[in-house]
């Protein structure tokens, strides 16, 4: 999860997030290169005396600053499109969970486990135990297995919400009357936190998401939900 004074992204817990981190570093390298070239050009302009105000045409220069940005855009667009298509792939998920956004809590349905349904509310400060996180912990966590593809069906009952867990590289809008879906495969057990990432009203900041990822063998032994 995120921590104070953190500079980079959160550690990846899914293949998609690993790809996003690589793409972030790739794009950042290009941005640094552009900044260096611009600052270098400004430095030369401000320090050299060999300037001319009579230049009215420079075909070579115009060709370069037209082709070079096009190449840079292609270098950014190709890996971005690859990741975009990866996020849309649905490869035979092991099971499906439905998430419904409300003002201001989440409802989860384990359709493959006897239709288990429960609500997940943020824990008020008075109910926090030692080690719990303020504004991030919930009364009922979403328990999921690692190393198994999971499909999330996401919708809303009232206004726009967004179901997001940064460490998994997930952010899917919850839209009333529409069912969106996303898949992920977690690679490490642990507790992972997210929040509603679409402004949805006065208590938008108070509808967190907590995923408890456990080994697949333990998950298959039976219900382990913290209800």
From Swiss-Prot:
Protein name: Cytochrome c oxidase subunit 2
GO cellular component: mitochondrial inner membrane; respiratory chain complex IV
Membrane association type: Multi-pass membrane protein
Cofactor note: Binds a dinuclear copper A center per subunit.
Mitochondrial intermembrane side: 1-14, 88-227
NCBIfam families tied to this protein: CoxB
Gene designation per UniProt: MT-CO2
Keyword Metal-binding in record: yes
Transmembrane intervals: 15-45, 60-87
Broad enzyme group: translocase
Enzyme Commission no: 7.1.1.9
CDD domains xrefs: CcO_II_C
Reactions mediated catalytically: 4 Fe(II)-[cytochrome c] + O2 + 8 H(+)(in) = 4 Fe(III)-[cytochrome c] + 2 H2O + 4 H(+)(out)
Molecular function via GO: copper ion binding; cytochrome-c oxidase activity
A Gene Ontology BP annotation from the UniProt entry: ATP synthesis coupled electron transport
Annotated family: Belongs to the cytochrome c oxidase subunit 2 family.
Domain of life assignment: Eukaryota
Positions annotated to bind Cu cation A1: 161, 196, 200, 207
Subunit structure, as described in the record: Component of the cytochrome c oxidase (complex IV, CIV), a multisubunit enzyme composed of 14 subunits. The complex is composed of a catalytic core of 3 subunits MT-CO1, MT-CO2 and MT-CO3, encoded in the mitochondrial DNA, and 11 supernumerary subunits COX4I, COX5A, COX5B, COX6A, COX6B, COX6C, COX7A, COX7B, COX7C, COX8 and NDUFA4, which are encoded in the nuclear genome.
Subcellular locations according to the entry: Mitochondrion inner membrane
Binding site for Mg(2+): 198
Mitochondrial matrix side: 46-59
Residues bound to Cu cation A2: 196, 198, 200, 204
Necessary cofactors: Cu cation
Function: Component of the cytochrome c oxidase, the last enzyme in the mitochondrial electron transport chain which drives oxidative phosphorylation. The respiratory chain contains 3 multisubunit complexes succinate dehydrogenase (complex II, CII), ubiquinol-cytochrome c oxidoreductase (cytochrome b-c1 complex, complex III, CIII) and cytochrome c oxidase (complex IV, CIV), that cooperate to transfer electrons derived from NADH and succinate to molecular oxygen, creating an electrochemical gradient over the inner membrane that drives transmembrane transport and the ATP synthase.
């Amino acid at each position: 999860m995120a921590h104070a004074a953190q500079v980079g992204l959160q550690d990846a817990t899914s293949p998609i997030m690993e790809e996003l981190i690589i793409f972030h570093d790739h794009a950042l390298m290009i941005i640094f290169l552009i900044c260096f070239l611009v600052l270098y050009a400004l430095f030369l302009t401000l320090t050299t005396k060999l300037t001319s105000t009579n230049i009215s045409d420079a075909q070579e220069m115009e060709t370069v600053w037209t082709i070079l940005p096009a190449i840079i855009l292609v270098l950014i667009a190709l890996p971005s499109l690859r990741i975009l298509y990866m996020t849309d792939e649905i490869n035979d998920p092991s099971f499906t969970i439905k998430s419904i956004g409300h003002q201001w809590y989440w409802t989860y349905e384990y359709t493959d486990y006897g239709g288990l349904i429960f609500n997940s509310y943020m824990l008020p400060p008075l109910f926090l135990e030692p080690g719990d996180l303020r504004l991030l912990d919930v009364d009922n966590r979403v328990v999921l297995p690692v190393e198994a593809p999971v499909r999330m069906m996401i919708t809303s009952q009232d206004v726009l919400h967004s179901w997001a867990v940064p460490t998994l590289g997930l952010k899917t809008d919850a839209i009333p009357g529409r069912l969106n879906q996303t898949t992920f495969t977690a690679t490490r057990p642990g507790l992972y936190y997210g929040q509603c990432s679409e402004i949805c009203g006065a208590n938008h900041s108070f509808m967190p998401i907590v995923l408890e990822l456990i080994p697949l063998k333990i998950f298959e032994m039976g219900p382990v939900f913290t209800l």
